[in-house]
Amino acid sequence: MLLPSKLTKSHLPDSTQSLLLSSQVADWRGIHLEYHHKPKGEENSLVLDQLHLLCVETTQRPCDAHKWMDGRFQSRPIIQGDVFVLPKQVQFRERFEGAIDYILLYLDADWVAAVAQEALDSDHIEILPHFPQPDPFIYQTGLLLKSAVEAKGSFNQLYGETLALALSVHLLQHYAGRKASRKLASIAPAPSFSSNLAAIADYIQIHCDRNLSLIELANLAQMSLY
């Protein structure tokens, strides 16, 4: 089973000038969050090697935006709750006509592929680029992850990695290529599922003072991380 990587600065583009918040201190695996503010008229260009990017627009007022992605162009106002999906190795450029705030969610592309391999029994998965469109699930998940980083609670690591897994499955269901668009395979629970769940609950209660991870709990229950 491929374990998600911890995304360090070497994996990420340099965006410190507009950065307001980062999950670097959260010690998450498979996902990295950034919260940015960009002034009017700034232009961004980006190509990610081994990461998928979800950009969650949080600006309260509509803002005209011009985006170039994968050889296509779109010019329209973006609104709060819009999300655009930039897969790995896809060229992207944008310019805004006003100041904006947004959340960036970087996902480990190898981990997303591993989730697809286990859930869909397929290694021919391709996440497709999507211009901004409303996606309530990604929008709310982005806000939850941002709140988790701000809170720095004891369940921060487990919380973040669980939501990262949910985002990976959501991507495969709604933003993947034709070969990935079939329904996720249903996996029958093992006979010991209930006892495993109880063991996990007991373990969390006993170790509530620790920053537990999703990987640690999956190993405890001898269950797949996915």
Language model features with spans:
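OB/S1-fold single-stranded nucleic-acid-binding modules
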Residues: 1-14
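N-terminal regulatory/effector-sensing and dimerization cores
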Residues: 11-127, 152-153, 157
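Alpha-helix N-cap/helix-start motif at coil-to-helix transitions, marked by capping-box chemistry
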Residues: 48, 106, 132-139, 194, ...
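Short amphipathic alpha-helical/adjacent loop interface patches that line ligand
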Residues: 109, 164, 197
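Amphipathic alpha-helical segments enriched in hydrophobic/aromatic residues interleaved with Lys/Arg
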Residues: 121-180
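N-terminal positioning helix adjacent to the helix-turn-helix/winged-helix DNA-binding module
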Residues: 137, 141, 189-200
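Basic/polar phosphate-binding segments, predominantly the helix-turn-helix DNA-binding elements
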Residues: 174, 199, 203-226
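Short, Lys/Arg-enriched N-terminal segment that forms or immediately precedes the first helix
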Residues: 182-186
